[in-house]
Amino acid sequence: MRVILLGAPGAGKGTQAQFITEEFGIPQISTGDMLRAAVKAGSEMGLKAKAVMDAGQLVSDDIIIGLVKERLTQDDCANGALFDGFPRTIPQADALKDAGVEIDYVVEIDVADEEIVKRMSGRRVHEASGRTYHLVYNPPKVEGKDDVTGEDLVQRADDTEETVRLRLGVYHDQTAPLIGYYQDWLKADSATAPKFVKVNGIGDLNEIKQSLLASLKA
């Protein structure tokens, strides 16, 4: 089973990705990890990518697609793979399609922007230990203080409302159009298009997992 996972930053893709990979025994493939591994291994596509990166340029979609095809031939992908953060744009999705890389499911984890802002901007962290709290869902016993040490909690720069909204803006501009892309492909050609699954990412974690599992096994 080959799955593309879509959803805004903070929608809970990481949690669901881990669940899917464990449930179906497939690896999670991110383009960053794939690039690093190919460069380290000195594969043909890895050497091409290294030459581009060494020149300070962006790795082209053609090279990324080549790396994807190369990665899918490895033993751990025999049962499929989960694509994390790829494709990110319509041109990448087109390139994947044109290269004949078959995808079984596209899964969208659907969470409204305001819920994501609430989730992420409410996070507070004890930097020394990495303990994480949330002002609404998991507040510390004493406001602004770590439960164990009593030291101050901080809000990471990535979690400020301004930063979260900026990241959501990038997602809506670049990646959200993929949802329409795959839905339109399915309407036009259901024989070759991946099945599209939309999962509500708000609510009890186990219920979300069961809903996702039922859709992928349907």
UniProtKB/Swiss-Prot annotation:
Gene3D superfamilies: P-loop containing nucleotide triphosphate hydrolases. One of its GO terms (cellular component) is cytoplasm. Residues 122-159 are annotated as: LID. InterPro entries: Adenyl_kin_sub, Adenylat/UMP-CMP_kin, Adenylat_kinase_CS, Adenylate_kinase_lid-dom, P-loop_NTPase. Its EC number is 2.7.4.3. AMP binds at T31, R36, Q57, L58, V59, G85, F86, P87, R88, Q92, R156, R167. ATP binds at G10, A11, G12, K13, G14, T15, R123, T132, Y133, G203. It catalyses: AMP + ATP = 2 ADP. Keywords: ATP-binding, Cytoplasm, Kinase, Nucleotide biosynthesis, Nucleotide-binding, Transferase. Signal peptide: none annotated. It is an enzyme of class 2 (transferase). It is found in: Cytoplasm. The keyword ATP-binding applies. Pathway: Purine metabolism; AMP biosynthesis via salvage pathway; AMP from ADP: step 1/1. GO terms for molecular function: adenylate kinase activity; ATP binding. GO terms for biological process: AMP salvage. Monomer. Consists of three domains, a large central CORE domain and two small peripheral domains, NMPbind and LID, which undergo movements during catalysis. The LID domain closes over the site of phosphoryl transfer upon ATP binding. Assembling and dissambling the active center during each catalytic cycle provides an effective means to prevent ATP hydrolysis. Belongs to the adenylate kinase family. Catalyzes the reversible transfer of the terminal phosphate group between ATP and AMP. Plays an important role in cellular energy homeostasis and in adenine nucleotide metabolism. PANTHER family: NUCLEOTIDE KINASE. This is Adenylate kinase. It comes from Marinomonas sp. (strain MWYL1). The gene is adk.
